[in-house]
Amino acid sequence: DSMDKIDGILRGLPFIEASCNSASFIYNGHTRQSFTDINGKRFMGCIDFIDEHYVPILGLQILQGRNVHQDGEVLVNEELLRQVGWTDSPIGRKLMEDNYEWGTVVGVVKDYVAQSAYQPQASVALVNSLERRWEANKRNLILKEPFKENLSRIRALMKETFPTEDIQFRSARQEVDNLYQ
């Protein structure tokens, strides 16, 4: 797959420390999505489509189970467990929206700020879905130092490699700081 090749190239660049994929950025709060609790009642939460590198690179803590490895595997946060009503282990359970199955839960991540510390904790599902992940096609890159020089290098490389595409780079630190200004 061409996207996997691009990822392999990015991860092999000497000025990139790490790379992961997702459909949105963690500081944007993910996409709003409804889920169904154990009584069949809908509630709103957040969803993101990630790869297996996302959780370790972004420093999310797995409290139970393991990280995603295969398509259709899901990580949920503590708040989603509470909202769904699962009081025993969620590992192996199906995350649902009415009759639609998002995937099988393989782990629980510690709650984290998914948009703003000024908002209540969101229910979050992180789904390993290759198809959905490529729809938005976001890359989270951690550059090695010196950051400015390496940012210039990756911008030049992308412009040369994809001359017809408008590939943009943003600093996660600046985006988070903007949330609190």
Which role does the model predict for each range below?
Residues 2-20, 71, 78-79, 97-181:
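"Rare, low-scoring activations can occur
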Residues 91-92:
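A glycine-biased structural micro-motif
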Residues 1-84, 88, 98-102:
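Structured, solvent-exposed hinge/loop segments at the ends of secondary-structure elements
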